[in-house]
């Protein structure tokens, strides 16, 4: 592990029904770096992301964030560890506002979203929109945005968690 590595994946293994899909994966990412995973169908890209996101348990190996080993057992544990990712297929709501799409995952339980003041939702969402460089009003209905803009909303949502 290098001194400036923020995310370190060491010797990760994952099998399904006796078939080893991840075979000793190693990766280091410094703070502020952006990486992509490239590979053909069945190469293990999605499996690795699902292990990092807490959707699959790893069979062995270590995940370190900022020098601390983390145990990612579910998606909430991944969020607590500071890991988030966006899917190729957007997980957004066309009929809701941009602010609602960004902030909906930040609430502790379902069914309380309508209790949060719109002004507070918009103020909070505006910070994340600025971070991703999207110049739209938080109250804009998501369905009015282009697909590229919706992807930026998805990134803002992931960052907000």
Model-identified regions with their sequence ranges:
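Glycine-rich phosphate-binding loops of nucleotide-dependent enzymes
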Residues: 1-161
């Amino acid at each position: 592990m290098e001194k400036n590595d923020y995310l370190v994946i060491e010797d990760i293994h994952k099998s399904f029904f006796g078939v080893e899909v991840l075979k000793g994966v190693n990766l280091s990412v410094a703070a502020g770096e952006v990486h992509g995973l490239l590979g053909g169908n069945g190469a293990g890209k999605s499996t690795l992301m699902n292990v990092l996101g807490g959707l699959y348990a790893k069979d062995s190996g270590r995940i370190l964030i900022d020098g601390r080993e983390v145990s990612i057992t579910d998606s909430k544990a991944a969020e607590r560890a500071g890991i988030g990712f966006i899917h190729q297929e957007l997980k957004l709501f066309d009929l809701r506002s941009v602010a609602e799409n960004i902030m909906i995952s930040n609430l502790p339980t379902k069914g309380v979203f309508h209790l949060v003041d719109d002004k507070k939702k918009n103020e909070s969402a505006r910070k994340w929109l600025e971070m991703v460089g999207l110049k739209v009003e938080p109250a804009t209905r998501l369905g009015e945005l282009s697909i590229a803009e919706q992807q930026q909303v998805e990134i803002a949502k992931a960052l907000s968690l």
